[in-house]
Design a protein with these regions (language model features):
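Exposed aromatic-hydrophobic patches
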Residues: 12-30
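Polar, glycine-rich mid-to-C-terminal structural blocks
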Residues: 1-11
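Long, ordered, helix-rich scaffold segments
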Residues: 28-172
Length: 172
């Protein structure tokens, strides 16, 4: 996607350096809302609280050329799905029902399939992207922790991925 930062030449990438708590930049000629790929190639540990939509995270997961951002998108999507499922099961589903639920939307499974099938991506990187957040990390994100529910939800997600991506796993 060519970008035209107001007052600069057209390019496909622009590095914007933050020097203040709040800053604004204007891009021209954009006809739709872009998906930001933030903190590209950054090596320092930074926590960024940006309200990515599911569609933006799916775009980053499937297409971002920055490996960390691709991994982070997968982690954010998986964590969001897990925490929502944990909250929902607390109110509605029994554990047995939860173990057989398809928690991951098909769009997430398809984006993960693209990663697994990508011929230029390293096998070790694919493994990282396809690894769900740990039970302990999921627990850290919750106000009320139910270890059995966390385990049940994560296992249901893991099982769903294993079954949905079995042909790709075997071919990899």
């Amino acid at each position: 996607l060519p970008l035209q930062l107001q007052g600069h030449n057209v390019g496909t990438e622009h590095t914007l350096v933050l020097h203040q708590e709040e800053q604004a930049w204007t891009f021209t000629g954009i006809t739709s809302q872009p998906t930001p790929s933030l903190l590209r190639s950054l090596s320092a540990p930074v926590l960024l609280d940006y309200p990515f939509t599911e569609a933006e995270l799916l775009t980053l997961l499937a297409h971002d050329s920055d490996a960390f951002n691709r991994w982070e998108a997968a982690q954010r999507l998986s964590l969001r799905i897990a925490t929502n499922a944990i909250a929902a099961t607390a109110e509605t589903a029994t554990e047995k029902e939860q173990n057989h639920a398809n928690l991951l939307p098909q769009s997430v499974v398809d984006a993960l399939r693209l990663v697994l099938e990508h011929p230029q991506l390293d096998a070790a990187f694919k493994e990282l992207v396809l690894t769900l957040p740990s039970e302990s990390y999921i627990a850290e994100q919750l106000d009320s922790v139910d270890p059995q529910r966390i385990h049940s939800v994560r296992e249901a997600m893991r099982r769903q991925l294993a079954l949905a991506l079995q042909p790709q796993w075997q071919a990899a």
